[in-house]
C-alpha cells in the first residue's frame, strides 16, 4: 500500500490531469535546435557516385517500389537500378533484373540540381528481401529492402511515424532513435521535410543535405510522405512561382495508382492498412479535385481486406497548442464527417512542434439552430495524433492552451517519434517515444481497437517520466 501511495504521488507530481487528459510536465531541455552544417553529410566519394538514395511505395498494393537517387552527371547507365532476391547465403545464383529510371533536374533561383533518377520496380514478390544497386563501374552502391506481406486483414506490420523532422542535431536523434527499433518496416511521414525554406532564398543545398542525412534509413525502408507547408517553396519575388517544385521533383509517388490527379493527395495499401494522404495546402472546397477524389476514395476502401484506415494530413484538425491553433479548422469542417462515417482509425498530422494525442471525438453535430459546436466523445471517430516533434530548426512549441481541453488525451512539449504496430484486424499497439528516453521506453501508449472489427473503447497507458 505504501509503495502504491508513493507511485501515485510521483505520477501526479510530473503530470497535470485536467478533464481526463494529461499534460506532461516533461519539457525538453531549453536548448536551441541547432542545424547541422552543410558538410555534416558530404557527398560520397568517387566519380558520379549516386547519393540521397530513398524509397517509396511504387504501386497501390505493395508489389512496387520507387527507387530514387541523385548523380552529379547524367552518364550512360547512371539511370539504371539492378535488383535481385536476396539468397541468404545460398549457392543459388540470383536472377538479376534491371529497371530504368526517369531522369529530371530543376533550377531554383541560383541553384541547379543534380540529376534526379526515379525508377519504378514492378511485380515484386510479397514479403521478400531484395538487394539493389545503383551507379556504374567503381561507383556502384548497394542497398536492400523488404516488400510487405500480401494484403490481408490479419497481416501484422509496423510503421514508424515522424513529422517536421528538419536536419538539426535533434532531428538526428529522432531518426536514429527510430532506426534503433528493429521492428520498423516503413515510415508514415506527416510533412515538413528539409526546412530549406527557412534559409535565404530557400537554399536548395539543404534539400541535398537532407537527402544524405535520410539515406541510412530511407534507402532501406519506404517513406509514405505527406506534403507540409515547408514543401510549398512558392517564392515569386525571386522568380519561383511554382509551388511544391523541389518536393515533387525529388519525392515522387505512385499517385495515379489510386486514381488521383495530383501527387499531393493519394493512397496506398500496405499489409493490413489503407493509408490516405491529403494536402492541407491544396484546394479542398466542394467539387475541387481533392474533394472529388477523397469522396470516391473512401468508398473504395475495403475494410475486409485492409481493416486499418489511416489518414495523413499535415495541419492538425484538433490541436490544443497556441501554435497553429485551429489552422486546420476549415478542412476539418469540410471532411470530418466523412472520416467519422468511414470509421477512420487514426489521423496523423505534424505542423505543431510538439506531441499530442486526442480522445476519439468529433464535432459534426452543429447546425444553425442547435448551437452544438464543441467536440464530444464519438466511438466512430478517429484518434488524432500531432507528431510535429521531429526536431527541426524552429524548435519546440511549448505553449499549450490552458486548461487542457477535454478532447486532448495526452500532450507534451518535447521531440520524438511514434510507432504503430498492427497485430491483426482488431488490435494495434501505438507508442510514442521521446528522444531523451531509450527506444524501448514509451512515454505514451495505447492499444488501439479497430473501428471496423472491434469498435470498443480503448484502455490507455501513459508512462510519464521526468
UniProtKB/Swiss-Prot annotation:
Main localization, broad class: secreted
Key words of the record: Glycoprotein, Hydrolase, Iron, Metal-binding, Secreted, Signal, Zinc
Tissue expression as described in the entry: Specifically expressed in flowers.
Binding site for Zn(2+): 192, 229, 314, 351
Active-site residues (renumbered): 324 (proton donor)
Location in or out of the cell: Secreted
Coiled-coil ranges (or none): none
Family: Belongs to the metallophosphoesterase superfamily. Purple acid phosphatase family.
The protein, known as: Purple acid phosphatase 6
Gene: PAP6
Amino acid at each position: 500500500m505504501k509503495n502504491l501511495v508513493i507511485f501515485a504521488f510521483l505520477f501526479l507530481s510530473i503530470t497535470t490531469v485536467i478533464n481526463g487528459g494529461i499534460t506532461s510536465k516533461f519539457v525538453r531541455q531549453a536548448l536551441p535546435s541547432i542545424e547541422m552544417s552543410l558538410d555534416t553529410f558530404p557527398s560520397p566519394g568517387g566519380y558520379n557516385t549516386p547519393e540521397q538514395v530513398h524509397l517509396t511505395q511504387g504501386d497501390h498494393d505493395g508489389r512496387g517500389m520507387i527507387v530514387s537517387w541523385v548523380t552529379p552527371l547524367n552518364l550512360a547507365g547512371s539511370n539504371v537500378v539492378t535488383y535481385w532476391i536476396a539468397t541468404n547465403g545460398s549457392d543459388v545464383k540470383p536472377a538479376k533484373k534491371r529497371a530504368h529510371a526517369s531522369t529530371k533536374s530543376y533550377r531554383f533561383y541560383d541553384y541547379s540540381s543534380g540529376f534526379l533518377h526515379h525508377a519504378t520496380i514492378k511485380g515484386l514478390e510479397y514479403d521478400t528481401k531484395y538487394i539493389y544497386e545503383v551507379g556504374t563501374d567503381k561507383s556502384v552502391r548497394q542497398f536492400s529492402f523488404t516488400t510487405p506481406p500480401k494484403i490481408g486483414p490479419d497481416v501484422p506490420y509496423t510503421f514508424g511515424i515522424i513529422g517536421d523532422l528538419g536536419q538539426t542535431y535533434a532531428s538526428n536523434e529522432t531518426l536514429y532513435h527510430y532506426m534503433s527499433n528493429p521492428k520498423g518496416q516503413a515510415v508514415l511521414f506527416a510533412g515538413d521535410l528539409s526546412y530549406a525554406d527557412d534559409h535565404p532564398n530557400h537554399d536548395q543545398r539543404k534539400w541535398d543535405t537532407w537527402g544524405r542525412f535520410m539515406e541510412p534509413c530511407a534507402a532501406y525502408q519506404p517513406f509514405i510522405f505527406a506534403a507540409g507547408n515547408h514543401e510549398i517553396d512558392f517564392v515569386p519575388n525571386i522568380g519561383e512561382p511554382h509551388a511544391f517544385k523541389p518536393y515533387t521533383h525529388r519525392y515522387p509517388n505512385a499517385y495515379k495508382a489510386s486514381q488521383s490527379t495530383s501527387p499531393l493527395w493519394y493512397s496506398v495499401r500496405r499489409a493490413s492498412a489503407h493509408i490516405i494522404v491529403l494536402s492541407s495546402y491544396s484546394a479542398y472546397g466542394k467539387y475541387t479535385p481533392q474533394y472529388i477524389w477523397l469522396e470516391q476514395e473512401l468508398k473504395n476502401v475495403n475494410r475486409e481486406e485492409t481493416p486499418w484506415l489511416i489518414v495523413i494530413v499535415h495541419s492538425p484538425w484538433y490541436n490544443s497548442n497556441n501554435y497553429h491553433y485551429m489552422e486546420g479548422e476549415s478542412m476539418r469542417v469540410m471532411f470530418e464527417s466523412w472520416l467519422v462515417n468511414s470509421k477512420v482509425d487514426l489521423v496523423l498530422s505534424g505542423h505543431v512542434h510538439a506531441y499530442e494525442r486526442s480522445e476519439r471525438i468529433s464535432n459534426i453535430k452543429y447546425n444553425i439552430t442547435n448551437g452544438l459546436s464543441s467536440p464530444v466523445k464519438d466511438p466512430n471517430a478517429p484518434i488524432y495524433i500531432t507528431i510535429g516533434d521531429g526536431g527541426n530548426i524552429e524548435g519546440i512549441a511549448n505553449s499549450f492552451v490552458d486548461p487542457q481541453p477535454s478532447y486532448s488525451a495526452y500532450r507534451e512539449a518535447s521531440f520524438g517519434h511514434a510507432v504503430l504496430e498492427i497485430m491483426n484486424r482488431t488490435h494495434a499497439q501505438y507508442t510514442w517515444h521521446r528522444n531523451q528516453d531509450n527506444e524501448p521506453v514509451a512515454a505514451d501508449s495505447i492499444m488501439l481497437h479497430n473501428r471496423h472489427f472491434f469498435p470498443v473503447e480503448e484502455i490507455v497507458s501513459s508512462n510519464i517520466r521526468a
